[in-house]
Amino acid sequence: MIVLALDVYEREKALSIAEDVKDYISMIKVNWPLIIGSGLGVISELKKKTGLPIIADLKLADIPNTNRLIAKKVYDAGADYIILHSFVGRDSVKAVKELGEIIMIVEMSHPGALEFINPLTDKFIDMANEIKPFGVIAPGTRPERIRYIRERLSKDIKVLTPGIGAQGGSPVEALKAGADYIIIGRAIYNAERPREAAKKIFEEVKEWSSR
């Protein structure tokens, strides 16, 4: 249920944290800071170190051919999933899905998203229901929006929610609203003892799910 967002630059730091918390997480999400700072090879290193699936959070948003070229390299490097924007349209999204599993962004939580992305949430949900990605991204800081998206999304499509922890989102509230995976970064990797931080969240989630 817990996805660790490793938004750090340093390879050694990323590998150390990942190994430290692997017992309490389900997947690892790498973003541009780590890929730029350490190279694509860090994806396979993380998989080898932890045995966990890797999400490449590239937020791809280009024409089909460019999306395809980028995605091929990232999947070849060992990524299990790629996150991409929906607003570029079906052709660009499908170009990536032809190569591997995808996670589509249907809504974001930052203020700027209200201008262009969030007004199209319903269209993005319809697109996801048609294309059948592994999952979609929904704002973990807004349980009411998680619930809205979950109710309109095919049951076989997972809901992943960033913004848990440092940004104010509650792990249990996100799960109650319909999230399948909660994405947590700073609350774990910036903690004085990342393993203990991950364990605490894991136990909180486990206690709720066993009720």
UniProtKB/Swiss-Prot annotation:
What UniProt keywords are attached to this protein's entry? Decarboxylase, Lyase, Pyrimidine biosynthesis
CDD domains, alphabetized: OMP_decarboxylase_like
Task: Give a yes or no for keyword Lyase in this entry.
Answer: yes
EC assignment: 4.1.1.23
Name the chemical reaction catalysed here: orotidine 5'-phosphate + H(+) = UMP + CO2
MF annotations from Gene Ontology: orotidine-5'-phosphate decarboxylase activity
- GO CC annotation terms, alphabetical: cytosol
Q: In which pathway does it act?
A: Pyrimidine metabolism; UMP biosynthesis via de novo pathway; UMP from orotate: step 2/2
Q: Biological process (GO) annotations?
A: 'de novo' pyrimidine nucleobase biosynthetic process; 'de novo' UMP biosynthetic process
Q: Which Pfam families match?
A: OMPdecase (PF00215)
Q: Where does substrate bind?
A: 7, 29, 57-66, 109, 162-172, 185-186
- Name the HAMAP family on file: OMPdecase_type1_A
Q: How does it assemble?
A: Homodimer.
Task performed by this protein = Catalyzes the decarboxylation of orotidine 5'-monophosphate (OMP) to uridine 5'-monophosphate (UMP).
* PANTHER family for this protein: OROTIDINE 5'-PHOSPHATE DECARBOXYLASE (PTHR32119:SF2)
Q: What is this protein called?
A: Orotidine 5'-phosphate decarboxylase
Organism name: Pyrococcus furiosus (strain ATCC 43587 / DSM 3638 / JCM 8422 / Vc1)
High-level lineage:
Archaea, Methanobacteriati, Methanobacteriota, Thermococci, Thermococcales
